[in-house]
Every structure is written in structure tokens, then in C-alpha cells.
């Protein structure tokens, strides 16, 4: 199979939405029957984002094969059916690490290792490998043109443009076309300078996607075309919209997919965007609203919980309600108590690391349990629910996780020292293991208890979900917790690790050690999130009676 490559760059400012634009184009091409994948090349020196602060970088998206990747891969999976893997995201740090490892082994036969050709060759190899088996591979280059960190990646795609030729490569550049209120017009000069910068390193863009708060007038499109040496039909206006799921239709209406298909000489059907039209209709026509309190520690940057935010919205679509997320700092819960948890239709406690704010999350779980409020715990959210139950129901005062208190008399949550990975291999860890790349990661089979809310949600006796954690329920206390009324509704493939818990005599109190948000999509939703929002809606109706 001959793969075509679309390289996506950004200029003028960061955070223009390259990932959304790339994913939206991929969605249109997929709707035309093409097999599409997307890659993200990140210019930072970290090997992967696994140890980066969520408040700096946003969430870490975990793929099926256990790669810790950029949050843009979450956008990719939500827009197209292709599942991402570790080949879809790599960083400068990972490239340098692999090249230096080869140098130490003597693979370069004593050559002087340089950015060109050794680093650029390594980048090109990964891009080509990632695109294998697909009709089209869209490659997003992180950062902004002009950044020193991005230069090796830009040089690599320049070389690929020459080596593969125009019939197999296309360069798409996102820029900002701001509107100046004082002048009453949009300004194209930033775009002109950005394209000039890109051309100075040997890349001439074939398509310009111009971001702005409004549509770009035809005369300004013509001006951009003239000064940037791009066909006028290839100047695409991408205005702000109230839903990212409207962007595929917006790009389709301007013929971007036709331009790509013609450039590559591909024969395929017209795009069928009916699924996306249905998503947009559901989003615009809710029958009600629920308020979900998300009790976390990284709430100053909502992108730290990007997939959770989107999964809640997807569940709202399936339940025909809009979901309003109220972000609650877990430290505020510690300081002010239950008053900050009033007026909610449900509580969700997402994953997290470190001791800061953990007691606030425990209080949130207690509030939901005692007030029959729907509760959904994810990863740490499951652990704090179990700790709260152990302390206040099972009679284990001062129960805790050894992550936060190594001297606790009841270590109901402890470090996983051994487990079976997705390929059936035995993995082992200990306290001195590195932080990076040492967690239980990736898709794992989970056996569900017959008759449980989990089994009802999944409509079966098993599920496969993605993990990212070091700590698990301590099996020593399972029997005591069960006797107190806790239900262990999900177990690992070897049935040795607890994956899900529920509570008896509660409308909806469900928590999982895994991260179901990573597999939720706007078209398909996710059974656990759908069940949670349905329970929140039912709770609201009971309160109104």
C-alpha cells in the first residue's frame, strides 16, 4: 500500500488547534472510505509526557498498547475509528535517546553523530513506519514555526517532501488571522510572515488553514493567496465554533478533502458525515441539564482532564441532556467541607498522583455515599472511595494508601509489585523503580460480576479498559470490605487484582481502577459514563419531586 502524507504545521501563535484541524480532516477522509492515521511529533526533550505536570502539559493520553502520549492523540481517537499506538507519538527526547543508544552500541561505526543526517533520518524512519498500512497519514508537528526546538522535525519533513514527491506529500499550515476592532478588519500580515518563515527553511505550504473569530472575507482570502503563493481555493477559513465536532463539516464545505483527494490521485466516494450531523443535532437539542462536580487537584487547567470532560459530554449526548461540569478543588473541600458539594447531580473523582488534596477527595466520596448521590471514581477516584469506606463503614480507622502514608495501620491500597500485562507477560516493580514508564499501562481484560451495575452497563461479563497506575487494592482486606457491604464487581484477567468496586443499597456508586475516558467517543459514548449521567439525571428528577 502506498501511503500519502499530510504534514500539519502551525504559525503565529501556539494553541491554534492543529490537533483538532488534523483530526477533523482525518474524519472527513475516513468518511470517504479511506484508511487514515494521525501522528504527533512533539519537540520537547522529555522521552514522553508520562512524568510531566498535568497543569503544564495537560492530560497524558494512554493508548491500547500502553504508550503515555500527548493529549492530541485523544482528539485523534475521538474523531476517527483508527486506534492510536506508541508509533503515533514521539518526542525529540525519544529520538535522541534511541540515537544515543545506537551510538553506544557502535551501530554508527564511529561516525560523528549529527542532527543532519542522524537525527533527521531517525525522525523520517518513524514517520514512514507510523504511516505503513494506511492510505493517508496526517503528521502534526508540535510547536510553532520559528521555535528552535521544532527545527529537526521541520527539516525532516522537508526532506520527506523531496524524497516522496508532490504526489505523496502535502503541507498544511495553520495560521492566525486576527480581527482588529479599532481598524474594523482582519489582518493578514501575521500569516504572510509565518509563511515567509516556513519557506525560509524550505517548506512551501500547499494549504493554509486560517484561524480567526470570524469567517475571512473573499477579498482577504485572495490577498493571502497572492502574498503566500497558495491557490485561492487552498486558503481555508476556520472560524471559532461552539463545538469542535462542527469542524469536519466546516472544512468539508470549503472543499478541503476534495483538494487532498485530487492532489493524491485517490479514487474514493463522497464524504458521508451523517454520523457527525447526528452528534451536532444531539448536542444542540438536549432535553435537560445535569451538573456534575469534578473533584480534582489540577482544575486550574481543564485540559488536565480533557478526556474525562469529553466523555461526560458524550454521555450527555447519549442521554439527551447537556452536562455542566463544576470544577471543585479537592483542597477547597478539605478547607470548607460539604458546603462546596451542594447542588450537584453527581460527583466524579478523576485520577491523580501525590498526597495534596487527597483528603478532600475522600470527603467527596463520603458525601456521595451518605447522600445517595451518584458517584463515579476513576483510578485514584476508586482508591479514595475504598479508603473512605474502610475508615467509616468497615471499622478500619486511619486506613489509607501506602502512596500517602507508609505507616498506616490499614494499608487498604498498596504498590503493585507484580501483574500480567496485555501480552501475558509478568511485570514486576518495586519502590525504587523509575517513575517514567514503570506503571501498569495499557489495555487490560476485566472480568465483571454477574448482576452488578458494571455488568449491566457493559451488557456482558467482561470489558477491556486502559490502565495507568502503580497502586491497587490490597487483597489482604478484600474479605473484610466485602463483609461490610462493598462489592468487587471487576477483577483482572487472572482475577488477582480488583478493577472495579460498587456499593450495595446505593443508586449508583461505581468506581474503576482503569481510565474509561480514553475509549469514549462522541459517536459511540462509553457505557460507564452513560450509566453515570443517567443516574445523575434520575437523581435530579427525584429531587424535583
Curated annotation (Swiss-Prot):
Residues at which UTP binds: 14, 187-192, 223
Quickly give the catalysed reaction: UTP + L-glutamine + ATP + H2O = CTP + L-glutamate + ADP + phosphate + 2 H(+); L-glutamine + H2O = L-glutamate + NH4(+); UTP + NH4(+) + ATP = CTP + ADP + phosphate + 2 H(+)
What does the entry list as the binding residues for CTP? 14, 147-149, 187-192, 223
**What interactions and quaternary structure are annotated?**
Homotetramer.
Sorted UniProt keywords:
ATP-binding, Glutamine amidotransferase, Ligase, Magnesium, Metal-binding, Nucleotide-binding, Pyrimidine biosynthesis
Species of origin reads Shewanella baltica (strain OS223)
Q: Which positions fall inside the Glutamine amidotransferase type-1 domain?
A: 291-542
Pathway recorded for this protein: Pyrimidine metabolism; CTP biosynthesis via de novo pathway; CTP from UDP: step 2/2
Q: Residues in the active site?
A: 379 (nucleophile), 515, 517
Q: What is its EC number?
A: 6.3.4.2
Annotated Gene Ontology cellular components are: cytosol
Write out the function statement from the record: Catalyzes the ATP-dependent amination of UTP to CTP with either L-glutamine or ammonia as the source of nitrogen. Regulates intracellular CTP levels through interactions with the four ribonucleotide triphosphates.
This protein is called what?
CTP synthase
Residues that bind ATP: 15-20, 72, 239-241
What superkingdom heads the lineage? Answer: Bacteria
